[in-house]
Regions:
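N-terminal Rossmann NAD(P)H-binding glycine-rich loop of SDR-like oxidoreductase domains
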Residues: 14-35
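Conserved glycine-rich Rossmann-like NAD(P)H-binding loop of the short-chain dehydrogenase/reductase
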Residues: 37-48
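Rossmann-fold cofactor-recognition segment
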Residues: 54-65
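NAD(P)H-binding glycine-rich loop region in Rossmannoid oxidoreductase-like domains
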Residues: 63-102
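Active-site segment of SDR-like NAD(P)-dependent oxidoreductases
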Residues: 87-89, 128-132, 171-174
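Conserved Rossmann-fold NAD(P)-dependent oxidoreductase catalytic core, especially the SDR/UDP-sugar
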Residues: 101, 105-144
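NAD(P)-dependent short-chain dehydrogenase/reductase
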Residues: 142, 155-207, 212-214
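C-terminal substrate-binding subdomain of Rossmann-fold SDR/epimerase-dehydratase oxidoreductases
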Residues: 197, 202-301
């Protein structure tokens, strides 16, 4: 990560990050530690000691078990929660019941722990997959259904208990260390370019690509914000094509052997980050060309 462009005016922590061992979680935990915050990572399985972010505490627990989360938050005097723990699209498709337990019950558990302990800062990941689309005007997969439910649950939780949460809808977050998930192909293509290897992105089309540095800054700013009602927002309205991604890679590595399969993925429709802009104002965007450069250089280091 480059130098952090944002430093909160007041301490945010201790910050509890559920799912903090994943790609986005690691980047956020690293940034929080660099800011001097106290950070507790809650995951079903903590990473090996050598893979942990120095300065952060790691605790194992099951997001489906509210008592696990409550114990950790109470023991560490948590002041903010970033809820990232979730099963992604393939896992939800393979085991819908488990997907609902982790993604929906887990979300309810995190909200209830925040309520019980008087924690007022609560930021969580939703997804563009929550947006209705297609002939049925519904999310296209169960992961999106679960995320849409979490958005509505958060709004009702505010009506019942007054917790003004912030839900963020990323689309494709890329950067070094992103090697898992359907859209990790963007990062994997950049890794291949850095290593001089061939790689075919298994789809084409247009999407919202955001470098992890930009997304981390948005999360930090949201943690420092004080909304008076629940906020749900897309992160960006910028849409680029896979051809744009390939061009950005070749601008850094002209010899790169990267391509895309002719399997089209539809571009997201109706995206709107006005709620986020109204809450935060501006932040430091990372254009695709710059994000590709950072990612390729990091993979090549």
């Amino acid at each position: 990560m480059t130098a952090l462009p944002f430093k909160p005016a007041a301490p945010l922590g201790p910050v509890l990050v559920t799912g903090g061992s994943g790609f986005l979680g690691r980047a956020l935990v690293r940034a929080l530690v660099e800011l001097g915050e106290s950070v507790v990572v809650f995951d079903l399985r903590a990473p090996a000691p050598e893979a942990r972010i120095a300065g952060a505490a790691y605790v194992e627990g099951d997001i489906r078990q509210q008592q696990d989360l409550h114990r950790v938050a109470a023991d560490h005097g948590v002041a903010s929660i970033v809820h990232l723990a979730a099963l992604v699209i393939p896992a939800c498709r393979a085991n819908p019941v488990l997907g609902a337990e982790v993604n929906v019950i887990g979300h309810l558990n995190a909200l209830d722990v925040a309520r019980a302990l008087g924690i007022s800062r609560f930021v969580y990941t939703s997804s563009l997959a929550a947006r209705p689309r297609g002939p049925l005007n519904s999310p296209a997969n169960l992961y999106g259904v679960y995320k849409a439910a979490c958005e509505d649950i958060s709004k009702v939780h505010f009506l019942d208990h007054g917790l003004a949460s912030i839900g963020l809808r990323p689309n494709v977050v890329y950067g070094p260390e992103r090697v898992e998930g359907e859209t990790a192909a963007i990062s994997l293509a950049m890794r291949a370019a850095a290593r001089g290897e061939a790689y075919e992105i298994p789809f084409t089309g247009a999407m919202c690509f955001q470098h992890v540095d930009e997304v981390v800054e948005i999360f930090l700013r949201c943690l420092a914000a004080t909304p008076d009602r629940p906020v749900v927002s897309d992160l960006t309205t910028a849409i680029d094509s896979i051809d744009d991604v390939l061009a950005a890679i070749r601008a850094v590595r002209p010899e790169a052997q990267v391509s895309a399969a002719p399997i089209h993925r539809a571009a997201p429709e109706g995206i709107d980050n006005a709620p986020l802009r109204a809450l935060l104002g501006s932040w430091q965007a990372v254009p695709l060309a710059e994000g590709a450069r950072r990612t390729i250089e990091a993979f090549g280091a």
